[in-house]
């Protein structure tokens, strides 16, 4: 069963939810069984460039802290922000899209995750909202609303 999913793309943690059969919103547990996913990414240099997102990224941060990124949302809409990993520069939109892809995968147990509404802080200006929509599109999502 498909439908519209809600995503909280948070600074520290993120989550995906969907309305159940009686119209009540329910958070969908991630692949690790948790209801929230750390908004973290780690580029593993020991496993051929594997990108870890969420709990796996948090667990990897002690091995290569310089290759782990958190609090990406603070940089949404900032065209000057970039993280250099092995000579490749990653901007906030690209990094946020990785978190959204993880949420999309985790939400798939409730049906195809395509149409989403993403929540952002009230203080987000139009540039930050647009960057969030771009990250959603990059993750293969149809962002029908930003709230």
Predicted regions located by residue number:
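N-terminal phosphate-binding loop and flanking beta/alpha elements of the actin-like ATPase fold
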Residues: 1-38, 43-147
């Amino acid at each position: 069963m498909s439908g519209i999913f809600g995503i909280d793309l948070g600074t520290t943690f993120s989550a995906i939810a969907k309305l159940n059969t009686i119209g009540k919103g329910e958070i969908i547990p991630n692949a690790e069984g948790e209801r929230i996913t750390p908004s973290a990414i780690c580029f593993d240099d020991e496993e051929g460039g594997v990108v870890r997102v969420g709990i796996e990224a948090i667990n990897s941060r002690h091995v290569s802290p310089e290759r782990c990124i958190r609090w990406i949302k603070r940089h949404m809409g900032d065209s000057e922000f970039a993280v250099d990993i092995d000579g490749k520069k990653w901007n906030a939109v690209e990094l946020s899209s990785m978190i959204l892809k993880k949420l999309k995968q985790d939400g798939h147990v409730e049906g195809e995750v395509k149409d989403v509404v993403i929540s952002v802080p009230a203080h987000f200006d139009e540039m930050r909202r647009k960057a969030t929509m771009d990250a959603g599109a990059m993750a293969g999502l149809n962002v029908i609303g930003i709230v």
